[in-house]
Amino acid sequence: TVVAVFLISSPWWMQSSDWFTTGFWIFAATGLFHPALSLYFTLESMDRAGATVSSTLAATSPIFAALTAMILLGENMTLLIAIGTLVTMCGVMSLTWIPGTGITKVMRVALLFATAAAVIRGLINTTGKFGLDLMPNAMMAGFLSHTVGGLGVLVIYRLRRGRLPLNMSGAGLRAFGLSGCFIAIAIACMYSALLRNSVTLVSPVIGTYPVFTLLAALALKEEKITLQIAGGVTVVVAGVVLINWV
């Protein structure tokens, strides 16, 4: 669905010159790592340790994005952005972490997979910024990375499950179709933000997505407001305010 949304809208943004740039190949290669490889690592982590640990470690991706941006792109991180990034990460972690969840021997491999997925997500923001400098087309960037990534996900699913997901209900198809539309919009917004701002500024804000997941769940009455949720959302908002404070 994500690729279909980009293709349908392509007459308004696709340019033939983009196909012959170095940035084209950067985003094509990017798709092999995210969403393809990062999804594989996430699934392995969830199978071994569950969604809680996996989601908590996913919140650390902004720090990897900031580090790689400073090393590879020469970006500078102000004190407010550094503090805001750490505050935001702590807030997101507080939303997903269950007290009393310890680290066991069984979970150690899962932690490696989850950390690898977080590193990839962080690095993708840096490579995306570099690619956009060579091919300043946010829509093309999203189209390329998720076309290649979508094919990679199908290959991974086939290897893991032994078959492709061909039998789906109508309700499931509609739900995934709607989800794909939102994901396509989110991807376009992310690359548009990276096109205009630094990785150290954009990445921590992107990392707040679990907050909106919780808010949507609350709106659909699938979650109840608890002290942990209220506190976590407050901390995340405070972190984002610090990051964008001028």
Locate each region found by the language model.
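Hydrophobic/aromatic residues within transmembrane alpha-helices
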Residues: 45, 71-77, 131, 141, ...
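Membrane-interface interhelical linkers
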Residues: 1-29, 39-49, 97-115, 134, ...
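Hydrophobic/small/kink-forming positions within alpha-helical transmembrane segments
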Residues: 31-36, 40, 62-67, 118, ...
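Juxtamembrane helix-loop boundary signature in multi-pass membrane transporters
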Residues: 60-119, 218, 224-246
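Structural signature of hydrophobic alpha-helical transmembrane segments
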Residues: 18-34, 74-90, 136-151, 192-209
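Interfacial helix-capping/hinge residues at the ends of transmembrane alpha-helices
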Residues: 42-43, 54, 65, 69, ...
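Selected transmembrane alpha-helices and immediately adjacent juxtamembrane segments
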Residues: 109-133, 137-140
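Alpha-helical transmembrane segments of compact multi-pass small-molecule transporters, enriched
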Residues: 1-5, 57-71, 86, 148-152, ...
